[in-house]
């Protein structure tokens, strides 16, 4: 009985450039020279990332796992796992590396313990590539209500002078009877719906940007320049900025020490008797201050005082002398005057910042400030055109934008980054030691996604890698078999380059005879 052998024809395309290379610094800036490389898709509900000096990319997952992408082996390893609760959007929510990570292997995490109603900010040591749980040094902890959802923020970032910045949310339910305006419900048993207990409370760690200076023994001290005196007489001494709703993603300019964060705003779609419509904000703190929530939003637009028992709408809050008279307030009544948001935009078009126009949801995030370095020897570092630029991004609207800053770190220009590419819900980003940008794309839904990935964005100088497309038709069958292969769609980004094509066959050792190849133009 005759037998029929089944084989698979495989092909690869080798494209070689036949032109001379140009100097890395000679070519003018071209936006088309940005290239995306997918590093891994092995991420499940990723939150934050941090890039080590050796290029290792650490990232955390909401479920409590700390993972690392090895740039040499191109693989993801589990570094460790923290016991957490994920109820009410809690979990492992913050990550940063010590400024001297190469020497001490210290990593900082913000997480939600199952046996404590709040958040822990702790330092751990990585030993032989694994998280040493016994090395934990608890730097700070603060309580939250877990009766109702939400707003935990969680972002961590070091400043240039060794200060650790900690973002905390207002821990307030955004819905209920506030109707998408200021959640200031003072009725009994309604504290989860009152942000005056947290963001506007000088005695609360919630709804804040905190600032401490970790010490080598695992304790911390209060640096100069925070909002309140170090003795705690006017408020928590760790508070750098108050009046925050949900500062979900934060970064610190590593040259100036200026703090940026994205403030996810409330849901009101239009102005009303209770006050202004909802806005998302990008905030900039050149120094300590009150950023207004829940009394003010955007460029200090005031909300109205509301009696939630009767529904009566009272006067607008006084922007010159805000007062917190909520029964849920445990701090000072008289508050510092608010600071306006740096950038802000509603659901609909923004008359103040048309570059941020868009529709649909809003989730403003603040990424890193890029500083170009002549001394950095790298063929992929971002060009000088992005020097002194803040990268902001939108989880809901799928974009990254560049905010160019002037010499005073004020707004100069906003432009869309890589306009030809749609980012799939960017959730965190950081520049690596080589000047490339690392980005986590969360994926399409608020859950576990098949399109989650970690990418690196390089700026390619000189000659660029061709875009290779190889397709195969009729590649499986019985002998004799005619297979059609094609390189249609292959092109070179440098138009004057010539390409050399080479087809190679693999897995042919067990065949009786080498296949006959016929090529066409």
Show where each model-derived region lies.
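Beta-propeller domain segments
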Residues: 26-30, 90-92, 170-415, 424, ...
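Surface loop/turn motifs at the tips and blade-to-blade linkers of beta-strand repeat domains
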Residues: 38-43, 80-87, 140-147, 239-242, ...
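Conserved beta-strand position repeated across blades of beta-propeller domains
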Residues: 47-50, 96, 157, 251, ...
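Asp-box/WD-like beta-propeller blade repeats and closely related beta-sheet repeat scaffolds
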Residues: 120-157
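Proline-enriched interdomain boundary motifs that mark the N-terminal boundary
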Residues: 463-471
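Short, solvent-exposed loop/linker segments at the N-terminal edge
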Residues: 474-483
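Acidic, Ser/Thr
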Residues: 486-495, 506
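Surface-exposed, flexible coil segments in extracellular/virion-facing regions
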Residues: 498-521
């Amino acid at each position: 009985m005759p037998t029929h052998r089944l084989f698979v024809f495989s092909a690869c395309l080798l494209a070689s450039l036949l032109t001379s290379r140009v100097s890395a610094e000679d070519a003018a800036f071209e936006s088309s020279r940005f290239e995306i490389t997918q590093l891994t898709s092995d991420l499940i509900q990723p939150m934050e990332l941090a890039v080590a000096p050796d290029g290792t990319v650490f990232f955390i997952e909401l479920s409590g796992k700390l993972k690392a992408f090895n740039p040499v082996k191109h693989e993801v390893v589990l570094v460790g796992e923290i016991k957490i609760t994920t109820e009410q959007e809690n979990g492992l929510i913050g990550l940063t590396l010590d400024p001297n990570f190469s020497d001490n292997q210290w990593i900082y995490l913000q997480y939600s313990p199952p046996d404590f109603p709040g958040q822990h900010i702790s330092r751990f040591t990585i030993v032989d590539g694994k998280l040493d749980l016994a090395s934990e040094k608890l730097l700070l902890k603060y309580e939250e209500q877990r009766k109702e959802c939400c707003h935990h923020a969680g972002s961590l970032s070091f400043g240039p002078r060794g200060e650790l910045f900690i973002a905390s949310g207002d821990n307030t339910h955004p819905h209920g009877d506030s109707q998408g305006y200021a959640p200031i419900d003072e009725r009994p048993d309604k504290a989860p719906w009152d942000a005056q207990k947290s963001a506007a409370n000088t005695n609360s760690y919630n709804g804040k940007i905190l600032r401490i200076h970790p010490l080598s023994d695992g304790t911390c001290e209060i640096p100069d320049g925070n909002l309140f005196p170090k003795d705690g007489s006017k408020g928590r001494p760790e508070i750098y900025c108050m009046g925050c709703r949900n500062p979900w993603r934060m970064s610190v300019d590593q040259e100036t020490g200026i703090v940026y964060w994205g403030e996810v705003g409330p849901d009101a779609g239009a102005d009303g008797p209770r006050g202004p419509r909802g806005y998302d904000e990008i905030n900039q703190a050149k120094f300590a201050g009150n950023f207004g929530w829940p009394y003010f939003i955007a460029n200090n637009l005031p909300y109205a005082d509301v009696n939630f028992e009767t529904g009566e709408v009272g006067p607008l809050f006084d922007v010159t002398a805000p007062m917190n008279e909520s029964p849920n307030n445990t701090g000072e009544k008289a508050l510092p005057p608010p600071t306006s948001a740096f950038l802000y935009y509603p659901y609909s078009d923004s008359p103040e910042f048309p570059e941020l126009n868009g529709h649909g949801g809003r989730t403003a995030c603040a990424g890193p400030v890029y500083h170009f370095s002549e001394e950095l020897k790298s063929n992929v570092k971002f060009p000088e055109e992005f020097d002194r630029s803040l990268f902001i991004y939108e989880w809901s609207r799928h974009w990254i934008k560049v905010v160019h800053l002037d010499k005073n770190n004020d707004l100069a220009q906003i432009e869309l980054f890589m306009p030809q590419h749609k980012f799939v819900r960017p959730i965190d980003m950081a520049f690596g030691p080589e000047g490339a940008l690392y980005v986590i794309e969360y994926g399409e839904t608020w859950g576990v996604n098949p399109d989650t990935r970690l990418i690196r964005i390089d700026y390619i100088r000189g000659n660029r890698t061709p875009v290779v497309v190889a397709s195969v038709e009729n590649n499986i069958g019985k002998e004799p078999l005619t297979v059609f292969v094609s390189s249609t769609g292959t092109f070179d980004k440098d138009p004057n380059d010539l390409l050399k094509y080479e087809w190679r066959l693999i897995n042919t050792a067990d065949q009786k005879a080498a296949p006959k190849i016929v090529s066409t133009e």
